[in-house]
Every structure is written in structure tokens, then in C-alpha cells.
Amino acid sequence: MSKSLVPEAKNGLSKFKNEVARELGVPFSDYNGDLSSRQCGSVGGEMVKRMVEAYESQIK
């Protein structure tokens, strides 16, 4: 994993990731080696989508 620009955000992002995974029905845990790339990508993609939407709503 690359070095975080804001290390304090790690816990919040982890919580956000688990929330999105739950909503999508993806069984995230401490070990995710048994998940497909599609499953992991759907969680990451949805996270990015929501973060962009949140940012865009702030700048309007």
C-alpha cells in the first residue's frame, strides 16, 4: 500500500470502505484474498464515485 497523504484519514476510509462493501453485498474482512477483482473494484469504484459527488456538492 502506498503512503497516505493524510494518515489520520485511514480509520475513516476503512470504515467508509466497509460501509460501501456492506451496501453492495461484498463480504469484506481483514483478509480479502478470496474476493474477485470485480468485487474489490466495485467497492473502490463506488467509494470514488461517492467522494467525487461529495466534493462536487461542496464546490457548487
Curated annotation (Swiss-Prot):
Q: Does the keyword DNA-binding apply?
A: yes
Site label Cleavage, positions:
19-20
Q: Name one GO biological process term.
A: sporulation resulting in formation of a cellular spore
Functional description taken from the UniProt entry: SASP are bound to spore DNA. They are double-stranded DNA-binding proteins that cause DNA to change to an a-like conformation. They protect the DNA backbone from chemical and enzymatic cleavage and are thus involved in dormant spore's high resistance to UV light.
Gene3D superfamilies named in the record: Small, acid-soluble spore protein, alpha/beta type-like
Family that this chain belongs to? Belongs to the alpha/beta-type SASP family.
Could you tell me what this protein is called? Answer: Small, acid-soluble spore protein 1
One GO MF term on file is: double-stranded DNA binding
